[in-house]
Structure formats: structure tokens, C-alpha cells
Amino acid sequence: MPAATDLANAWFAKRGWKPFAFQRRVWAAVERGESGLLHASTGAGKTYAVWLAALRAFKPRPQGRHLAPIQVLWVTPMRALAADTARALQAPLDELQLPWSVGVRSGDTNSAERARQARRLPSVLITTPESLTLLLTRAKAREDFATLQLVVVDEWHELLGNKRGVQLQLALARLRHWHPGLPTWGLSATLGNLQHARDVLLPQGGLLVQGRQDKALQVDTLLPKAIERFPWAGHMGLKMLDQVCHEIDASASSLVFTNTRAQAEIWYQALLEARPDWAGLIALHHASLARDTRDWVERSLKQGSLKAVICTSSLDLGVDFLPVERVLQIGSAKGIARLMQRAGRSGHAPGRRSRVTLVPTHSLELVEAAAARQALLAGHIEARFSPRLCMDVLVQHLVSMALGSGFRPEQLLAEVRSTWAFRQLRDSQWQWALDFVCHGGSSLTAYPDYQRVERQADGVYRVTSERLARRHRMGIGTIVSDANLQLKYWSKGGGGKTLGSVEEAFIARLRPGDTLVFAGRVLELVRVENMTAYVRRSTARKAAVARWNGGRMPLSSELADALVEQLDAAAHERFEGPEMRAVRPLLALQAQWSALPTTSTLLAETFKSRQGWHLFLYPFAGRMANLGLANLIAWRVSRAQPLSVSIAVNDYGFELLSPAQVDWASHLPQALGTADLLEDVLASLNAGEMALRRFREIAQIAGLVFGGYPAAQKSTRQIQASSGLFYEVFRKHDAGNLLLGQARDEVLSEELEIERLHRQLLKMSELQLDLQALRRPGPLAFALLVEGMRETLSTEKLADRIARMVAELEQAANAG
């Protein structure tokens, strides 16, 4: 075995590699016991920078009959990454014959492995934030982690901006309490605010190491054979099917990314119908497929035996697929960081080029494609910010820490305040959380199930009920979704193969005998019982495609700004790049019939139709912020003039349709102020209903609502009813309940993007209003008209109506 200081160099030399400067810097920092955040492009060698640093610093030696106890804790955001990471970490241990073991602990870990880990944790444990918290609830958790020397948080950018990251901050605070100064390293890519990312992970300070960012990245676009001058969203992009087939054919192995699981299912079916000879050579991958199916797809990708995989964000992160030569993105990626992340799935190794090809689903996405490439070259990457003062996560953490050995309030308070998320936690907030887990707050004191934590005679707070402890452990985590039904093949004797899971709301719309598309198969629904939908294969040609909530992502601010810059250039007759030259006829028509948005103007259009008077406004603020702006402006104008409006939005702008004419030239400038923004936004929307929806998630995280045991899961309707009851009880009898306030704050920050709304209003008020009266809707307005009709027409009627409108508008455009 080489000397410890030569371990890394020896292993690199064995593979014909030379360490990069950033890798050497990390090695030296870990040897000094320092912490840090390593930021480098995908596939640049971050994993081995930190892993080989650990081997050099901690000098593995034989420990008698046993392999070394736990030395390194490796936290990953996805269970799918754990096995892949384990293989990557095991390789140098095997080749250098080092006496360390590597183990995985996640929701997929079998009972035999869990039992082994209960006796002794492996030298290196790869786990998720949820499983780490579960390990910390054990009575001997401190003893289990007594030999821990290093924590590594992989893909930190994926955890930073959500409650899973907050949960991890609290877990790390517990480990740091046991091991003051515990070295911690975060690994990150595609992030625009590195200082904040480092400060959240390392509140005591640490290094910021910038890795190689010069990885070759090629971004190109498949240009449609014909440019539609009247585009509309909602296409699956299947007009590009032949061209996508040609691109897949030209590469040994490709990933085809879609933004939704339903779109992935549709594209998989379409590709197989277009190329039956690809059966067995292409595959489908998304989070709702059965684990063994996803494992098979990932193994086959690694082995290079698949021509293409149609996938969603389930393959966004760090799984290492060396054979993948290129990535195709169907539709807009909606953000620069997401596009970079997906591009990095190809050429996933130092020195190799990554290539992503954008496949527009409608003509305006050509402008987005040009904007995305320009923003990538300029390095404009989205920032992510940690949530603050998540009281539901704190309540869950208090109960978790009361399990096992329990906690003393003063010591745990110091721990909690050492995290970035709770550094400003007030004494009153802490006392409320403590009272809530002990007594259920001021409104649940009569119910024993909500008196989860008890103060013992020795001053230690513990959970004494085994039943409540078991329920709590099953609910640990912050990932909340609608109840899912297992999808299984029907077998009279039971025990049919599991295909995956679908949302209860989708299955509720089907009756036995109806057909659906799932996992690339056409299936017939047989029956539904005990949260399981039983199906059999079907030969039907048409079927409903399984749908999941959460499919529409808003356009990021960075991509939206880059998009407006491209339109500004077009307004000044500059059409750079193949995408902008291709879409020039559409933009020329927009300029002829109206005007193009620019960086110095705010385009607004008015139009009279049989439906009424239309206002189209284009802030380019993303779907959610545009929805907030539309409601805000309609409400503010209605105070001066009684107004009944219907609203349609997309990422570029919104439509207000009213039965009466409105003097927008005088009303709009007044409606764009930021004064009283919070009050006006809350008044303009059904904020109570939105807060109730958000409270359902908060109630589950805080442990108020139990989702049921594995064999007896509660339905979405049951969970909604329970959380709705709590919401009303708190609203009427416990108005100071901090979970209610949190629900409102989350609606404002996450659903209405109040900060973005504020910034957008400031920006809009500084722009010159360009109000155009239209004789007929132009390309930008047409996209919004279709969004409005989508709410009132069936799919077939909508398609017919759009076809007639396009024919009429094309005739007018051709007539000049």
C-alpha cells in the first residue's frame, strides 16, 4: 500500500490522470482540518477531489478483524445517486487495498443491511438528509458517530433552496455539537451565489474553492422545417419527431430530457412508433417508475447498451454515464442552471465536451434558445437562497431530537441558532415551538396525540410513547406530495409486478376498463383498492397519459432578461445566430402589427373581439409573477372603475379580458406602484385558499397529519380534510399559531414570488409604456389568447378553434 500522502497521486497515476490545481488545493485544506465549498462544472472531478483528500488525511489502517468504523459521512440529495456514489468511492479502496468499507443508508436499503448498520456503521456512509435525521433519532446515535472525521454534502445546490436543506442544516448542527470544528465540504455546480451557499452550509466559515469552469460546452438548436408565425404553448414538440430521430441515430447514446413525466411518456411512445427497430434500445426514466426499472435503465446507460433514454429531472443529478455523447432538451429548460446541469450529463468526465441540443416545441422557444446560449456564455446563472425560520421543520426536529437520548432545551436552542436558517430565531418563537410539541399549543391541549414530547424529572425532554415515536419516524422528511397509488399488474392470486406510482387524482378520473399510458405501455385499469391500482396490458390504440401535478416551471429571471435582450436586438434589426435568423419572419410580423418588447420599453397591447376588450401586457416575469401582476393590476384598476375580468398568463406576459373598455393609458402607470404591495396582493387574490393549500404541506411536515402506515396509507382527500380541520381550528382559536403565519409567508414568497413581483414593478415603472392598439392579435398576443381559451374549451374544440384562427391570421399576414 502506498504511503498515505501518495495515495491520491498513486491512484491518479494508475489511471493516467494528473490532478488539477483545485483538487490539490482541496487535498491540502482537508489535511489542515479546514471546511469549504467546492464549486466546479459537472464532470470536472469534484468527487475525487474530496474523497482522495479524505484518504490522504485520515490514513486508513487495518483495525484488527474489523474494517474501520465510520470516518466519512457523505450526504446526497437523491437515493438514485447513492449507489452510483458508492461505486465511485469503492474503486480507489479496492485498487489501493485500503481497509475501509462503503455503505448506503436510504429508503431503499434492505432490512439486513439496516441491521448490520445498527450494530456498526460502515467506514463511509452515503445517505440522504431524511435518513441522516432518522439515524440521529437512535438512542446511541452519539456513540454511532463517535469516530466521524468528515462530512461531505454532494450536490449542495440541490438542497440549498428548499426545506430539505434546512433539515440538513439542523442535522449537521447536532453532529457539530458532538464534534466541534467537524470538517465539512460541500460539492456544487451551476450556482450563481456561491458566498451565500458557503455561508449556509458553513456558518462558522470556510474556504470557497473554484474548480475548473472551462469545460467545453456546445449548445445548439434543432431548427423546425417551418416557422409558425402564430405560436402557442402546450405542444409536446412532436412536430420535431423526425429530426429528433435523426439526431439520436447520429450518436451512440443520448439523453432526451423533457420537463414533465407525461411528456416523457408521450415522447417514448412516439419514438417507438416512429422507429420500431429501437425496441429494447431506448428506455424511459422518471421518478414515478418502479425502482428496479430505473436501476435497470441506469445500469444499461452505464454499459452503453441503450441508444437513448427519455427522461425528466430524475436524471438531472450526478449519476455518471460516460457513454452518453449528447443531450437533447425538449422545450424550454426554463433556467440557465438547469440547462447547464442537463448538458453536463453528456461528456461527463474531465476534458470531455458536453453537448446539449435544444428542441423547440413552438416558434417563440427559438428566441429562448438563443437567449439561453447567450446567458450561458455570459455566465449568468440563477441564485438559490435558503429558506429561513421554517417552523414546521423546527417542530419536526424537536420531536426527532426528543427520540432516543432526548434533549435539554438550552443546549438544543444553541444548536438550532448555530444554523443559518434559524440564526435569527427569537426566544418567543423557540418557546412556542417547545410548547407546541409538548402540549399542542393553545388549541390542542386536550388531545394526547399532540402532546408528543414530555419533560422528564432530570430536565431532559423525551418522547415516551412508542406509538408516537413510530409514527414520527415514518413521517420524517420535508418532501410532501399528493398521495400516490401503486400501479401493479392484476393477478388473481395477488403479487403482480409493481410498475410504479401514479397520483390519486389521475386514477380518480378513470373507471375500470379505461386505458392509460404508463412506463411506455398501454394498460387497462382493472380495479382500485387499498391505494393500489391494478392494471393489465391493453391493445388499445388511444389511452390517457398519466398526469402528475407540478409540471409547469416558471421562466427564471436570468433567462427572461436574456430573452428581452434578444428581442431588443431584433427590434434594432440585429438577428444574431441561427435561431434568431430562423424566427425573423415571426418577429417581423410582431413589429409590423404591433411592436417588439425592448430593454427600455414596456409593451402593452389592446384589442377588441367578440369576447370583449383585451389588454396584453409583457413584463417577462415568469408565469407565477405574471399571475400575481395580473391580479394586482386588475384589483387596483377596479377600485377606480368597476371591473370584471378574466385572466390568462404565460411566462412572457398576461391578458386581462373585460366586457367593458378600460382607459389603460391612464390606469396602467398608476397601477404599477410598489406602495402597499403586500396588502394589495393579498386583497387581490384568494389568499386564504392559497394559504390553506400550503398549510396542508406544513401540517404534514410538522407531524400534525399522519399519512398512514405502509399497508394502510391515507388518501389525499383524508389528508386534506385533516389538515383543513387544523387550519380552521387554528384560525378561529389559535390565531397566533406560527404555522399559520408560515403558510401565508410561503404563499407570498414561493407561489406569488413577492420579491420578484416587487423587483418587476420597480423595473416596469422605469420603462416607457408602449401602448399599441391592435386590429388583430399579433404573435405574442395570440399565445395569450390560446392560454385563455384553454380554460373554457375541450382539447378537440381548442385545436379546431386554433386552426381556424391561425388560418385567418395567416391570410391577413399574407395580404400584407
From Swiss-Prot:
Known role: A single strand (ss)DNA-dependent (d)ATPase probably involved in DNA repair, translocates 3'-to-5' on ssDNA, unwinding any encountered duplex nucleic acid. Unwinds 3'-tailed duplexes; both RNA:DNA hybrids and double-stranded (ds)DNA with a 3'-ssDNA loading strand are unwound, substrates where the helicase loads on a 3'-ssRNA tail (DNA:RNA and RNA:RNA) are not unwound.
SMART domains: DEXDc, HELICc
Similarity section: Belongs to the Lhr helicase family. Lhr-Core subfamily.
Entry EC number(s): 5.6.2.-, 5.6.2.4
NCBIfam families on file: DEXH_lig_assoc
UniProtKB keywords: ATP-binding, DNA damage, DNA repair, DNA-binding, Helicase, Hydrolase, Isomerase, Nucleotide-binding
Sequence motif DEAH box, residues: 154-157
Reaction equation(s) it catalyzes: Couples ATP hydrolysis with the unwinding of duplex DNA by translocating in the 3'-5' direction; ATP + H2O = ADP + phosphate + H(+)
Top enzyme class: isomerase
The keyword Ion transport is assigned to this record: no
Positions of the Helicase C-terminal domain: 240-402
Domain (Helicase ATP-binding): residue spans on this chain: 27-193
Protein name stated in the entry: ATP-dependent helicase Lhr-Core
Region (WH domain): 403-480
Residue ranges, annotated region (Domain 4): 481-816
Binding note for cofactor: ssDNA-stimulated ATPase is most active with Mg(2+) or Ca(2+); Mn(2+), Co(2+), Ni(2+) and Zn(2+) stimulate at low concentrations only.
